[in-house]
Structures are given as C-alpha cells and as structure tokens.
C-alpha cells in the first residue's frame, strides 16, 4: 500500500475508497503457513483495509505463526510494531473492545518477554483504551506516566513525539494510524504528522 493512497484524504474516506485494492493481500495472509518479516510488514500495511473481526483474526494468526520467527535476535520488535499498528487501527475506527483486547495481548506479550522498552509505553496505550471508553481523566493520567518515564530517561525525541501524540489523542484529533515501516519512512503516521 502506498502512502499516496492516504495523503490528503481523510482516513475513513481512504478506507472506503481503496479497501478492495488489498483483497489479494488479505487472502494471502489468511492462507500462508508461516509468517516472517514480509508477512508481518504486509499485515501492518494492509491492516487499515480490514474489517475489525478480520483484523483481530489476522492478529491472532500473526502471533501464532510468528513465534519461531520472533526468537531470532532483532526480529521481536517487528511483532511489537504490529501490535501498535493494529491497536491504532482499532482506535481510529472507535473499536474500543478490539483495541482493548489487542492492548491486553500486547501487554501480556511484553511482560512475558520482559521487554523493558515496550513496557515503558504500556501505560500510554492503556490510557488510550480508557479514552475509547470515554474516561478522559484516567487516559490522561496513564499517558502522563509514560511521558514522565521518557523524560526521566532523557529520551527527548521520543518524549516530544509522544507528548504531541497524547495531545492529538486526548483532543480526539488523531485521524491516523501508527506504522513503523522502513519502506514508507520510519515512524510514518498516516493522516497525522508531528508539528
């Protein structure tokens, strides 16, 4: 999926307009036996085109089929990036239940593997789930926990990015998805770019 599909077009309009273009990719993902880098990247790129139930189904398939792949050093972060993308797609379409289920799967995976870098971001995304359930005060408190940790660690760029993201999310002004993809430029956010 090319960035131009979404550039300057509201994400929901782009979804309706271009959803059918990705049917063959969805079919491939549902029918492949093993998932590696290619499949996880493809899944993240086409996630926006999937209906919520299909997106959830593909996420559970991705987790199961990428277990061997994730044991190779350096590859586990691709699965974490996939969680982030899928979560943000559910959030964009106000699918609070699916977003919360995705968050719990993601968090369980992070804590089981004791992935400290990902653990720092868990309060932020837990806060986002609370916002989807209309609890803005709890959302702001949880997001602030992540911001405080980033600030204490001296991670200025990441702090700045997540501070901007929290502002957009809490103001319900976040019309994009989170997608870390080296082919589209690292940290691309469709429909949203840092000021």
What do these predicted ranges mean?
Residues 1-4, 13, 50, 93-97, ...:
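Short helix-adjacent coil turns
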Residues 18, 55-56, 96-100, 138-143, ...:
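Solenoid-repeat scaffolds in large eukaryotic assemblies
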Residues 137-195:
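C-terminal non-catalytic interaction modules
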């Amino acid at each position: 999926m090319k960035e131009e599909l979404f550039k300057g077009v509201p994400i929901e309009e782009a979804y309706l307009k271009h959803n059918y273009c990705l049917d063959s990719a969805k079919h491939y993902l549902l029918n492949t036996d093993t998932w590696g880098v290619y499949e996880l990247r493809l899944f993240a790129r086409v996630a926006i085109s999937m209906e919520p139930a299909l997106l959830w189904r593909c996420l559970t398939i991705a987790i199961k089929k990428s277990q061997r792949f994730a044991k190779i050093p350096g590859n586990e972060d691709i699965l974490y990036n996939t969680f982030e993308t899928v979560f943000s797609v559910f959030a964009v379409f106000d699918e609070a239940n699916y977003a919360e289920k995705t968050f719990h799967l993601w968090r369980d995976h992070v804590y089981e593997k004791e992935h400290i870098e990902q653990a720092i971001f868990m309060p932020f995304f837990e806060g986002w789930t609370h916002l989807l359930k209309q609890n803005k005060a709890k959302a702001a408190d949880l997001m602030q926990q992540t911001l405080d940790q980033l600030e204490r660690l001296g991670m200025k760029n990441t702090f700045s990015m997540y501070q901007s993201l929290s502002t957009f999310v809490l103001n319900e002004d976040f019309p994009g998805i989170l997608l870390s993809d080296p082919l589209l430029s690292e940290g691309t956010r469709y429909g949203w770019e840092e000021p």
